[in-house]
UniProtKB/Swiss-Prot annotation:
The active site is at D283. Signal peptide: none annotated. The keyword Hydrolase does not apply. It catalyses: 5-(methylsulfanyl)-alpha-D-ribose 1-phosphate = 5-(methylsulfanyl)-D-ribulose 1-phosphate. The lineage of its organism: Eukaryota, Fungi, Dikarya, Ascomycota, Saccharomycotina. It comes from Zygosaccharomyces rouxii (strain ATCC 2623 / CBS 732 / NBRC 1130 / NCYC 568 / NRRL Y-229). Residues 205-224 are annotated as: Disordered. This is Methylthioribose-1-phosphate isomerase.
Amino acid sequence: MSLEAIKFDRSEPRKVSVKVLDQLLLPYTTKYIPVHTIDDGYRVIKNMQVRGAPAIAIVGSLSILTEVQFLQLDSQKSTQWFYDLSDWSNVNSKLLQRIEFLLSSRPTAVNLSNSLTEIRGILQNSSDLSDFDSKLFQYVCTLIDDDLANNITMGNNGAEYLLESLVQDGFQGEFGVLTICNTGSLATSGYGTALGVIRSLWAKSQSQGSENPPSKKQKKDAAPTKMVQVFPLETRPYNQGSRLTAYELVHDEIPATLITDSMVSYKIKTSPIPIKAAFVGADRIVRNGDTANKIGTFQLAIVCKQFGIKFFVVAPKTTIDNVTPSGDQIVVEERKPSEFRLVTGTAVDYVNESPILNDSQEPQSAKVGIAPPNVNVWNPAFDITPHEFIDGIVTEKGVFTKDDKGNFQLDKLF
């Protein structure tokens, strides 16, 4: 059974159902939150109950659809929200205001901004609320279906490129890879971006045999070149690596060893399995290839460069901002100090690590303080990795590498 971050029932196009997996409760509790309105979408995005740039864009778009359908089903609600359904210009103006509000939930991720720009265009070209409803439904269905298809394509593109590169470099045998944050099914419509490449690498390692003959550059009797271990970084301070990526790897039975962010240099130096690549996602890639991603990504890129490990960013075309020239212009979101000073998780028995249940027989969530409550905290959600530290950008259109001058040519995607 595949993991689902978003449950979208589209069987009734005029009465869709949207539920979002509360990722703050993972890995011990699986609970879905209904999304009926833009306010609901804003809340689950802002609170990081859903995260990952593609998933944020999907949930944001779906929340507009559910609000539009809710308005048509409940005229009383429309009055409470100050919509005048008898005046299309009023509805149009109000929706534009609501879309701007939704955009403020997570300003760094470009996917949400791109999707909302598309939706503004659909709104301006709609004759009434019913027309907008129909067009928006088609848009979100395409958004979700394309995201999944692109993820699978990116997974194969990245896996094949790495394996071919390793053979060209003269490497043969088993290897491991690094990743940070969560870029899998929980961050997308399914399969994942960077974790999708890792899934594809694992699938290829499992299927190696007569149907996958060795490359001409490989020695005839050499061990096959295959990924056998993943090293996900914990990803402080929100622990997406330990809570979510480790959860997905265990679910898919992909061999993995969880490490803290500060262990990566020593792990690379001492690992009996050579670590040959790092795959990370992106919340925004600008024109020159500079990449905004989860805090700690830049640090990982520096370490990889020191050890000669290939560093890849994996993201669809929708994550590329072809207007902003460099990472210096990216607005980096800063989170609340309490998210740093406190750790939220499931209360467990000290001896056997089983979850402690509340009165409803559900795992009990708890917050634990790990820093003085009055200490100053700096808590950026993202950092910017300069393109000089990136070996390749994996997209659904192929793998982009730098030219002889050290520049990416991402404009070829547009």
